[in-house]
From Swiss-Prot:
The Vlp and Vsp proteins are antigenically distinct proteins, only one vlp or vsp gene is transcriptionally active at any one time. Switching between these genes is a mechanism of host immune response evasion. It comes from the Bacteria. Residues 1-18 form the signal peptide. It is found in: Cell outer membrane. Belongs to the variable small protein (Vsp) family. The keyword Cytoplasm does not apply. It is a lipid-anchor. A lipid is attached at C19 (N-palmitoyl cysteine). This is Variable small protein 8. It comes from Borrelia hermsii. Genes for both Vlp and Vsp families are on (usually) unnamed linear plasmids in B.hermsii HS1. GO terms for cellular component: cell outer membrane. Keywords: Cell outer membrane, Lipoprotein, Membrane, Palmitate, Plasmid, Signal. Pfam families: Lipoprotein_6.
Length: 218
């Protein structure tokens, strides 16, 4: 995000330097392009800032959702002593309640962040629709997991938990994975739209001046 903000600042500087201040009287936060187009830098800068921050928030949510995949790798495992690897925990196999609780808490955090994101002012109807879809998919996952008696207990088995959170080894898992797959897809589409909105805001500032057509008079 820092790189993107730095690029925006540089773009603002370049636009300012390339604009001329001739023509109509301008306000302190306005500049004019060579074709006479007046840019409200304060307004455009805020629009870019808001769009970039929104996209960063969506990216954070996507990272949280994808972290479930990392938690799934620890199903039935323990840390191998003096190693950076995991190994099967024969003494605690089929006792994944705490692991599921961790994944569930991550998803509750995602749910809360999506709710907050939905209250963002001045976002497009497209983004509002995609947020609503992601909220719905998140709720479906949460509802599925919390209602499953095989999952909501300390002795949750490896097999059952894989069907809840392991997209790799149980892609059709009926205890939550199906809903998790849908949520991942929905969040991915939301992030794509958020990035597009940020790029559009930047493009509004950097749009090239239209070249004047040559005169047809001889």
């Amino acid at each position: 995000m820092r790189k993107r903000i730095s690029a925006i600042i540089m773009t603002l500087f370049m636009v300012f330097m390339s604009c001329n201040n001739g023509g109509p009287e301008l306000k302190s936060d306005e500049v004019a392009k060579s074709d006479g187009t007046v840019l409200d830098l304060a307004k455009i800068s805020k629009k870019i800032k808001d769009a970039v921050e929104f996209a960063a928030s969506v990216k954070e949510i996507e990272t949280l959702v994808k972290s479930i995949d990392e938690l799934a790798k620890a199903i039935g495992k323990k840390i191998k002593q003096n190693s950076e690897d995991l190994e099967v925990d024969n003494g605690k196999n089929n006792k994944n309640g705490e692991l599921v609780a961790g994944a569930f808490q991550v998803m509750l955090t995602v749910k809360a962040k999506l709710e907050k994101l939905g209250n963002t002012p001045e976002i497009s109807e497209e983004l509002k629709g995609k947020i609503t879809d992601s909220k719905s998919k998140c709720k479906e996952f949460v509802d599925k997991v919390k209602a499953d008696s095989d999952i909501s207990k300390a002795e949750a088995t490896d097999e059952h938990v894989k069907k809840a959170i392991d997209q790799v080894n149980a892609p059709a898992g009926e205890k939550g994975v199906v809903e998790l797959v849908k949520l991942n897809k929905s969040i991915g589409e939301l992030l794509k739209a958020a990035n597009a909105a940020a790029e559009a805001a930047i493009a509004e500032l950097t749009a090239p001046v239209k070249a004047e057509k040559p005169s047809q008079n001889n």
